[in-house]
């Protein structure tokens, strides 16, 4: 390969990592619940991106394409023998360094919500993570998961139905 083309490809990868690296890491972390594994998976995601960059046709948004790779890599990890344990909800969100009571209560609420989300079936958990935490639209979530928009809407609706009584029971309300 021409060294100039290789530099261009590396520059594109660097720009993608700069813009989306943290977002991909967060999504993967939310899916697998282990910081070290999430970092490894994120690295694998960007290796795949580098290898596939020339084949990206632009039929979907670059963020959707990246998230699809991240979701697939995370699913592969969760199916593997490397992942055979339950993780605590406290590992889902970064721990706050402050000790203000209000922030502690807010953190506890986030952890409880995260624990409830992680208790959902995988199909519902994925759409919640991509739609709410990942900030993808219905269309982008459908593309990332390789399902129809209707399936995403149905899964979101059913996930909310399952979460509502759990949130009320935990005293976290429902808006």
Which residues does each predicted region cover?
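Sigma70-family region 2
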Residues: 6, 46-61, 81
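Internal acidic/polar
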Residues: 84-115, 137
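DNA-recognition helix of helix-turn-helix
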Residues: 71, 145-169
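A short pre-motif secondary-structure segment
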Residues: 127-131
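Arg/Lys-rich amphipathic alpha helix in sigma70-family domain 2
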Residues: 55-57, 68-89, 106, 158, ...
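Conserved RNAP core-binding helix
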Residues: 17, 25, 35-52
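Structural recognition of an alpha-helix C-terminal capping motif at a helix-to-coil junction
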Residues: 40-47, 60-72
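N-terminal module of bacterial RNA polymerase sigma factors
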Residues: 1-23, 30, 109-113, 118, ...
């Amino acid at each position: 390969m021409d060294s100039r083309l290789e530099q261009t490809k590396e520059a594109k990868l660097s720009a993608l990592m700069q813009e989306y690296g943290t977002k991909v890491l967060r999504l993967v972390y939310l899916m697998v619940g282990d910081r070290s594994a999430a970092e490894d998976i994120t690295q694998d995601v960007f290796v795949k991106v580098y290898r596939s960059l020339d084949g990206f046709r632009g039929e979907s948004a670059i963020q959707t394409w990246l998230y699809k790779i991240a979701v697939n890599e995370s699913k592969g990890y969760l199916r593997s023998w490397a992942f055979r344990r339950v993780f605590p909800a406290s590992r889902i969100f970064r721990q706050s360094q402050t000790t203000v009571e209000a922030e502690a209560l807010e953190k506890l609420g986030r952890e409880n919500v995260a624990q409830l989300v992680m208790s959902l079936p995988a199909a519902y958990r994925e759409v919640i993570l991509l739609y709410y935490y990942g900030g993808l639209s219905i269309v982008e979530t459908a593309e990332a998961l390789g399902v129809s928009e209707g399936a995403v809407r149905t899964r979101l609706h059913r996930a909310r139905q399952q979460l509502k009584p759990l949130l009320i029971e935990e005293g976290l309300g429902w808006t």
